[in-house]
Every structure is written in C-alpha cells, then in structure tokens.
Design a protein with these regions (language model features):
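Sterically constrained small-residue positions within well-ordered secondary structures
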Residues: 11, 70, 82-84, 136-138, ...
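Sec-dependent N-terminal signal peptides
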Residues: 4-14, 18
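Intrinsic disorder/low-complexity segments
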Residues: 17-19, 82, 125
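Mid-chain, structured segments of secreted extracytoplasmic proteins
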Residues: 62-111
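Non-cytosolic coordination micro-motifs
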Residues: 21-60, 95-203
Length: 203
C-alpha cells in the first residue's frame, strides 16, 4: 500500500501557501506516513466530519513563493460520519493543468479515476477555479490555474484503494449496496432496543 501525506492548503489573495505536513498531521492526530487504512481507521474512530487533503504517489507540493503560485495535483477525500452507516468516504478530484507539471507522480491516478467516471456517467466537465479573486483565463497569466470537476455533476466516488484506483459511484446506489447490510443491522438493533424499553415501561 502506498503511503499518503496529509496536508493543508490555503489560496488567498493570489498567493498559494502550503502548510507544513507536520502541522496537518498534528491537527488531525494521524501519524505522518500512515497508510490509507490507518488514517481512515483513526478518522472513523474519532467520528470525524469534514475534509482532509491527501497526496498519493510520492510527490510533495510544488510551491513558488516568488510568484505566489503553486502547481500540483490534488486527490482528496471528504469524510462524514453517519448514524446509519459506518463513516462514508467520498472522493472528489481536482488537479492543476500546465504542460510543465502534467506528468508529475499521481496525475495518472487522477486521470484514471476521472476516466472511469466518464465511462459510466458521461463526460466530466472541467472548469476554472477562482484564483486571487478572479477566474484565471490564461494559463500564462498564472501557473496556479486550478481546475476541478464541476460540482453540479455530483461526482462522489466511493473509493476502494488508491493502489489500483478501484472506484464505484457514490450516492444512494452505493448506500443501498455497499452499506445496506450495516444499515439493516443498525435498524434492527435500534428497533430491538426500543422494543425492550417499551416492554419494560408502564405504557
């Protein structure tokens, strides 16, 4: 299993600043260099809700403080804890596009995930993201033109391992399939608890 690196990212006033990996690890309480399964377990045990960025493929953030831009790809997961299922892991993909960095480690993994989505659900539209208070129209204007999958296509990929990019589409379909057993077990357990409470009451 490949290693993953947690990191935080701030893009403000046209300057991209990458927080240190150690600070991100301290915040989330997951040891640096943990495997994918290890930090998923840690997050799940904490009942964590929110977003965390992960790097996969052995490439660190490329930062140019001189020009106030950065250039790299992102693969990140969004995790939320629910009462009816185990923690649900969603993946959304965003990545930078310039000729200079198009072949950095990990870019192929991002492309593979997007390709699988497109094969099943149609073309995934790429749009420009705000940078420094404006939409970057010209890649030569700023190397920090970040592209991401358009939100309205509702791309939520339940993820089954970065090693081979196994992907299934998220949403109700996945909840009804992958997690239905857990949902049923939870519902049965709660129903029994309620029944026990009622049988022991005066009502």
């Amino acid at each position: 299993m490949k290693k993953v690196i947690l990191f935080g990212l701030l893009l403000s006033m046209g300057v991209a600043t990458a927080f240190g990996q150690k600070s991100a690890v301290q915040v989330f309480g997951v040891p640096f260099g943990s495997t994918y399964e290890e930090f998923l377990t840690a997050f799940s045990e904490k009942g964590f809700t929110g977003k965390t960025y992960i790097y996969e493929g052995g490439s660190d953030v490329e930062v140019s403080s001189i020009y106030g831009t950065f250039m790299t790809y992102e693969c990140y997961i969004e995790m939320r804890a629910t009462k009816l299922t185990h923690t649900v892991y969603k993946i959304k993909i965003s990545f930078s596009v310039t000729d200079k960095y198009k072949d950095i480690p990990g870019m192929e993994q991002c492309r593979a995930i997007i390709s699988r989505f497109e094969e099943k659900y149609g073309k995934a539209t790429l749009i420009q993201k705000m940078h420094g208070g404006k939409v970057v129209q010209d890649l030569e204007e700023s190397s920090a033109a970040i592209w991401h999958l358009e939100d309205k296509i509702d791309l939520e990929l339940f993820y089954r391992g970065f090693d081979d990019c196994k992907v299934t589409y998220g949403g109700k379909e996945a909840l009804d399939g992958i997690f239905q057993k857990e949902v049923d077990q939870y519902n049965q357990q709660k129903a029994q608890e309620i029944q026990n409470q009622l049988s022991g009451s005066d009502f």
